[in-house]
Each structure stands twice: as structure tokens, then as C-alpha cells.
């Protein structure tokens, strides 16, 4: 519906603008993807940060990951309930620890050590997400099973991932951003609140390097959709592997992974190559996505290309 679609489109337009401006100002792709995903985490219309959906206990457990293509350094976090911007904590894990992944209490303790901004967990609980949880509990479903009850198919987002929601609200998903600069340096970042009515402690594809997020010297990928399907197919890494080992173009690799390797209605992704090729395939009804190129061309869309 327009009242749900418009704020998301406006959010994508804003994020596209700040991302392009940052690249023009010679910010690194790593800086750019963190900046854009932070903006999405701060927008209650997306399922990350302030807009995160709720677990079956009515709590928030956020997760995120970030990866630099050239160095292949990466950082990931999950089980966060008080960190304002999970993507920035993921970057700190990458840059300030010998590890790649911190979760739950250990991640929140690390956030305090680093002086990361935290808030009371109630900050993340919105009326809209309380209602979503109520509907999911009444239907006795984790919000991923759209085979019954009035669930629409998942929609995904270039600046966000999408999962099904009751009453035609198909705008719950992960947010993600990929970027490449004029030197071909690449980066990817992904963040989410997960699934409506998920079990406490459930971890999806978003913080898993190679599943929801991946970047190397060939491409950067951020995936969205049903986390379990993305994990099983190692979606983000498979796109890069097909380019590396089979010599496929980015579009060929991304299309193959989405349309041949994953069940229909479960996956979408955004990807960019070192040469600046863009791919945004999805096998869901739609996917919120946006992209911009250095020549000034840009696109914001939901539905499949005509």
C-alpha cells in the first residue's frame, strides 16, 4: 500500500543520495556502506535498528556484518538488544579485535568498552512491530512461512531485505548496501532485526560471511530473504565463486544463484563488480532496491523490471 511504500522509497532515495555524495567525496567503499546502512538502521520503516521486528518473547535481537573486498577483512555481530547501530559495532569487531564475530552478551560488553552508543531495549520496540508479532502469534507462524494465512511473498531491498508480513505488508526485511569506487575497491554491509516471531537466539544469514554478506576483489554482495535458504545456498559467496572459478559475469552469476540455486520466493540480492556492473535479482514477488552509477543514472524500484 502507498502509505507503507512511500516512506521506504523516500528512505532509499535519501540513502542513495548520501552514498553517492560520500563516494564523490572520495570516502572508501567501506565507509560508504557503513554510512548508508546506519541511515537505514535509523529509519523505522526498515527491519534493522529502530525498525527491528520482535522475537517470540517480544524482544529485539539485531544482527549485522560488514566486509572489505580488497583486504577481505570482515566483522559480524548478533543478539544485540541495546546497540543503536549494529553495523558500526560489526566494523569495530573487524578493526579492533582479533576476531570476526561477536554475539549476545559478549558483543554488548564489547560495545560498552568501545563507547558505542547504546539505548534501552524499549527504544527499538515500535507499535507496528508489536502488531506484527501479535498477528504472527495468532497465526502460529514465524513470519517466513507465507504458504498459508494472508501473507504476501517476500520483497527485498537493495538497501533492504524483505520478508512476508500479514495483511499485505510485505515490507519486512534486511537492509544492505554494496559499493565500488573508481579504483575498483569493493565493500558490502548488511543489517537486520531478523524474522517476526523468531525463536530467541535464532541467527539468520545476515551476520554470516558468505551467506548474507561477502566481498572480495571481484564483487560485493548483500543478500536478503529467508535466512535459512540463504545459509543453505551460501548465496553471497556463490556469486563471487562463480565469477572466480567459472568466469561468469556478475549478472550471470547472480541470476544463476537466485534463480537456479534457491527455492522460489525466498531470496534476493544486490551486488556490484569491481568494474561497476550492477545486479539486483530476486525470486520473490518484489524487492525494494536502489542503485546509482557515476554517470548520474539511478533507479529505485520494487517490482520486477518490465
Swiss-Prot record:
GO terms for molecular function: beta-aspartyl-peptidase activity; hydrolase activity, acting on carbon-nitrogen (but not peptide) bonds, in linear amides. The active site is at residue 174. GO terms for biological process: proteolysis. The keyword Protease applies. It comes from the Eukaryota. It catalyses: Cleavage of a beta-linked Asp residue from the N-terminus of a polypeptide. Substrate binds at residues 202-205, 224-227. Gene3D superfamilies: (Glycosyl)asparaginase. Keywords: Autocatalytic cleavage, Hydrolase, Protease. The record marks 173-174 as: Cleavage. Cleaved into an alpha and beta chain by autocatalysis; this activates the enzyme. The N-terminal residue of the beta subunit is responsible for the nucleophile hydrolase activity. Developing seeds. The keyword Hydrolase applies. Its EC number is 3.4.19.5. Pfam families: Asparaginase_2. Belongs to the Ntn-hydrolase family. PANTHER family: L-ASPARAGINASE (PTHR10188), N(4)-(BETA-N-ACETYLGLUCOSAMINYL)-L-ASPARAGINASE (PTHR10188:SF6). Degrades proteins damaged by L-isoaspartyl residue formation (also known as beta-Asp residues). Also has L-asparaginase activity, which is used to liberate stored nitrogen during seed development. Heterotetramer of two alpha and two beta chains arranged as a dimer of alpha/beta heterodimers. This is Isoaspartyl peptidase/L-asparaginase. The lineage of its organism: Eukaryota, Viridiplantae, Streptophyta, Embryophyta, Tracheophyta.
Amino acid at each position: 500500500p502507498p502509505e507503507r511504500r512511500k516512506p521506504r522509497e523516500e528512505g532509499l532515495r535519501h540513502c542513495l543520495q548520501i552514498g553517492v555524495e560520500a563516494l564523490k567525496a572520495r570516502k572508501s567503499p567501506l565507509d560508504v556502506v557503513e554510512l548508508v546502512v546506519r541511515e537505514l538502521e535509523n529509519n523505522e520503516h526498515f527491519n534493522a535498528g529502530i525498525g527491528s521486528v520482535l522475537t517470540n518473547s517480544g524482544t529485539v535481537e539485531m544482527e549485522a556484518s560488514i566486509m572489505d573486498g580488497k583486504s577481505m577483512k570482515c566483522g559480524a555481530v548478533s543478539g544485540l538488544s541495546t546497540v543503536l547501530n549494529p553495523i558500526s559495532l560489526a566494523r569495530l569487531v573487524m578493526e579492533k579485535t582479533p576476531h570476526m564475530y561477536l554475539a549476545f552478551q559478549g558483543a554488548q560488553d564489547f560495545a560498552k568498552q568501545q563507547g558505542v552508543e547504546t539505548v534501552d531495549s524499549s527504544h527499538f520496540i515500535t507499535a507496528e512491530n508489536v502488531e506484527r508479532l501479535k498477528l504472527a502469534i495468532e497465526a502460529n507462524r514465524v513470519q517466513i512461512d507465507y504458504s498459508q494465512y494472508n501473507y504476501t511473498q517476500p520483497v527485498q531491498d537493495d538497501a533492504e531485505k524483505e520478508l512476508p508480513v500479514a495483511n499485505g505488508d510485505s515490507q519486512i526485511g534486511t537492509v544492505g548496501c554494496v559499493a565500488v569506487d573508481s579504483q575498483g575497491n569493493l565493500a558490502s554491509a548488511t543489517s537486520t532485526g531478523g524474522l517476526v516471531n523468531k525463536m530467541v537466539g535464532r541467527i539468520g544469514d545476515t551476520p554470516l560471511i558468505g551467506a548474507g554478506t561477502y566481498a572480495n576483489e571481484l564483487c560485493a554482495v548483500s543478500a536478503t530473504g529467508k535466512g535459512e535458504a540463504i545459509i543453505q545456498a551460501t548465496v553471497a559467496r556463490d556469486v563471487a565463486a562463480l565469477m572466480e572459478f567459472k568466469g561468469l559475469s556478475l549478472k550471470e552469476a547472480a541470476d544463476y544463484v537466485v534463480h537456479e540455486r534457491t527455492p522460489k520466493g525466498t531470496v534476493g540480492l544486490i551486488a556490484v563488480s569491481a568494474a561497476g556492473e550492477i545486479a539486483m535479482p530476486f525470486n520473490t514477488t518484489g524487492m525494494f532496491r536502489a542503485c546509482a552509477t557515476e554517470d548520474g543514472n539511478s533507479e529505485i524500484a520494487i517490482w520486477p523490471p518490465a
